[in-house]
């Protein structure tokens, strides 16, 4: 800065004692010049007040701008992250996590509604009394932001498809009277000011409770039974009043508005915080005597415990860690400590690996079932082949097979380990006579229905469990009459299909749709024992029977005997065919075919049948035993009864007496009684069977009642119609279903009698 940069008033007004007149410039004092130079140097060293103010303002503005940008950037990032989490349902909230108004009256239905709607119960219950549409309803008052609408599914029908549609509208329902369309989606949603979406049909179950609300950002969050599912709608205009709109569509025929305040209060967990529990109780497991009461106290909240907030996770973990082993030890106490320790070790292993313990089928000895190496291309098996998991990016090709054929009456339990609600559909169950070892991965189609086109015997039932959840247990078994029954979570068994029980069948599962991972168990039957091959039969001798004395030990030909019982090791008589039992594990089975030809004999506890199944392959022989009423007096005639042997030709070979095979089709066997006192009962039973079979063979068609039955329905296998009526039924008359079991008819096979 030079002299030219000095303000003009600096030399004139600011410092009058330093003012220089032009006539005195040549006569200025040297001291004055030095003083001026010093003042100029000082002026150059420090900025002017204006410059100082400008610098300060610039620095403050830069700091403010930078801090504002940083704050805005961080806020935007956090807001964007939260929005992404909410959109994908990654943020789980309980009904009390989002504050909403609690001073509003309970919701009621508006007087403006669809033609098929009837309002009752003080305006809180809406029913659709006919058809499946024209059932649009509104709330009687506008709803607030974050106000939760709780809807209970009061009535459900199975005659339709689809579920309710729900959402919001900014149009006053009064203005819509007389102009409501049939459907909310898409008739109403195509108009401005309407937002609605369909609820998945799997959630539309009786007594389920749907809750939803709209937040300030215009997102609609919904949940089922106190478990939040995520965002279902976006872009709601929250600047105006909003009424909720519900279309009672499809299978949902009746809904009820619940008071959200009461519902939220009832759903609050009543768990005791861990801090209030004494240290001794936290460290020590519960006694076995108190285990049952502990479980009963938690049982009503089992469904809600799955969605409890994170602070109760420790309580749930301790419950599974201490109570469940104690409960397992209750029914295993009589079997020895080693068995109980094995069961507890298995439960501990499951909990350590994050697998849910068995809850509904814990009674009885359960054995894990390994899966076959043959599987679908999108399935991964664990190292021990006990757990099957489908890849998350695919929804099909999840086939897994049992490693061995199943047995008649054997109970198999499938436990669901993981689900994904993004996909539609669920687990499929099937049975086949095809050995999985003969299949290639390319032989398995994406849709399990196409397995029916293969030359082998295949039966499939899709969606065996409606919307399975983690921990659900689906049990199934094949009855002696070919019925395949399924029960979910130890509920009532339902017959889903009929199979040919005379074939050797492998079970298979299609880990499809929402089902992601599962494992399988089988229940050990106490009266199903595998016997080694030992081609001889020891028959107990008795002094009261001469023929038994002559044939105490009898060798059976290798080509004749299929399987028989040897009770020599147990020194016990087989009292009657209807009372066959395996007393001890030391019993042996005389079987043909060498070491590899061992057989499996199954005698259910009801004593009505005798099942003999070859492990290496072949036809399963099922013998229907006579009723116990035709038995002779055990005390008086027991010694006169020889032990019988079931042969491959269907004839019973015994020491003195032989049996009669009534029909090779039904494999019903009658043994000729020796005692005269039993002739009448046996003859009556034989005559009744003969009359029944003659009646069945000449039975009339259940449709026309004129022609005899001469057709078989595929896949259920029922014979109830003549061929002409079956063809008409198959082509759509009556819905193309079997009139007995309502199974879909896929083919009609004509039969001929000689």
UniProtKB/Swiss-Prot annotation:
GO cellular component: cytoplasm; cytosol; nucleus; perinuclear region of cytoplasm; plasma membrane
Zinc finger (RING-type): 701-742
Residue span, NHR domain: 106-260, 368-523
Main location group: nucleus
CDD domains (UniProt xref): mRING-HC-C3HC5_NEU1 (cd16647)
SUPFAM superfamilies with a match to the protein in the record: RING/U-box
PROSITE patterns assigned: NHR (PS51065), ZF_RING_2 (PS50089)
Key words of the record: Developmental protein, Differentiation, DNA-binding, Metal-binding, Neurogenesis, Nucleus, Phosphoprotein, Repeat, Zinc, Zinc-finger
InterPro entries: B30.2/SPRY_sf, Neuralized, NHR_dom, Znf_RING, Znf_RING/FYVE/PHD
Bias type Low complexity, positions: 280-297
A Pfam family the protein falls into: zf-C3HC4_3
Signal peptide: none
Residues the record lists as Phosphoserine modifications: 338, 341
GO annotation (BP), single: asymmetric cell division
PANTHER family xrefs: NEURALIZED, NEURALIZED-LIKE PROTEIN 2
Function (record text): Involved in neurogenesis. Interacts with other neurogenic proteins in the specification of the neuroblast versus epidermoblast cell fate.
Protein name: Protein neuralized
Organism (species): Drosophila melanogaster
